[in-house]
Regions:
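Solvent-exposed, extracytoplasmic
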Residues: 190-219
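Short, hydrophobic-rich beta-strand element in sensory/regulatory alpha-beta domains
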Residues: 72-73, 80-91, 208-212
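Short, basic/aromatic recognition patches
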Residues: 137-162, 193-203
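Juxtamembrane extracytoplasmic/periplasmic/luminal helical "stalk" adjacent to the first N-terminal
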Residues: 1-42, 46-58, 166-167
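Conserved beta-strands of PAS-like sensory domains
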Residues: 163-199
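Extracellular/periplasmic ligand-sensing ectodomains of membrane signal-transduction proteins
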Residues: 81-147, 222
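Short amphipathic alpha-helical segments
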Residues: 20, 24-27, 59-75, 196-200
Length: 258
């Protein structure tokens, strides 16, 4: 029995709901750690919490907390996520204006990092990404949550920093103890090819060709041969929103040529 486009849109929503729920689950202990640090309370196991005088969390404490949260998801047999972590802005990490507590999942013949058989820490300090560090607040994955105070999906785009592949970046704002100031984002990267493995069977179960597009009409995945990832799709005979996401399923989408 074939599916309807609405059922396919529901399947898309379910996948992204799972990632957003995971981000929310990670955000809570990170905010608790930062709040405890601001209050001068050592929040991490082993007495490695922040000092009362600074109100800042120690980098090692933050890194340990974030690693304990994200590594289990990156170590799954068939992980949905290819990267995850927390990016701190401002003066919440001792001795740092910005701090990337970010890990990459196992990589296969990556042109930048080679192949890895387990998660690795993203170390921007050794890779010459000074411009990236200087300008990251202007990037969509950070700028939109900072402006709206809501979770956001960026992409699809080619991640030249880490995976060198089409990805979607999901980010959620992390706030200070008062909940008034955003102090960073918790986030996760999903490779488009991983998303395709999770959803393609559902898309193929509809007789008409379909395309999953973002709010700008850019293709994430498609069963229309004329449409490739990243291409702009033209209007379709029907558009079905994917609830809780910026995506929609277009039925019989036209190729725009760009």
């Amino acid at each position: 029995m074939s599916r309807t486009p609405t059922e396919v849109a529901d399947a898309v929503s379910e996948v992204f709901r799972g990632v957003f729920d995971q981000l929310a689950a990670w955000r809570t202990p990170i905010e608790q750690l930062l709040a405890a640090s601001a209050g001068g309370v050592g929040a991490a196991a082993g007495g490695t919490g922040a000092g009362a005088s600074s109100g800042e969390v120690r980098p090692v404490t933050l890194d340990t907390t974030v690693a304990d949260l994200v590594l289990p998801r990156l170590e799954e047999d068939d992980p949905m996520l290819v990267g995850a972590g927390f990016i701190a802005d401002g003066e919440v990490v001792r001795g740092k204006g910005v701090h990337f507590a970010w890990w990459l999942g196992p990589l296969d013949d990556n042109p930048v990092l080679g192949s890895t058989d387990g998660p690795t820490r993203l170390d921007l300090s050794t890779r010459g990404y000074t411009e990236y560090l200087r300008d990251f607040r202007a990037l969509e994955w950070y700028r939109i949550p900072a402006t709206t105070r809501h979770a956001h999906v960026t992409g699809p785009y080619v991640d030249h920093l880490c995976t060198c592949d089409y990805i979607l970046t999901l980010t959620m704002p992390v706030h200070d103890a008062d909940g008034e100031r955003m102090v960073g984002v918790v986030g996760a990267d999903v490779a488009v090819r991983t998303l395709e493995r999770a959803l393609l069977a559902a898309f193929l179960d509809v007789e008409e060709p379909l395309a999953l597009v973002n709010e700008h009409g850019r293709v994430v995945l498609s069963t229309e041969p004329a449409l490739q990832v990243g291409q702009l799709a033209g209007p379709g005979s029907e558009t079905v929103p994917c609830t809780g996401t910026p995506f929609a399923v277009r039925v019989r989408p036209a190729a725009s040529g760009s």
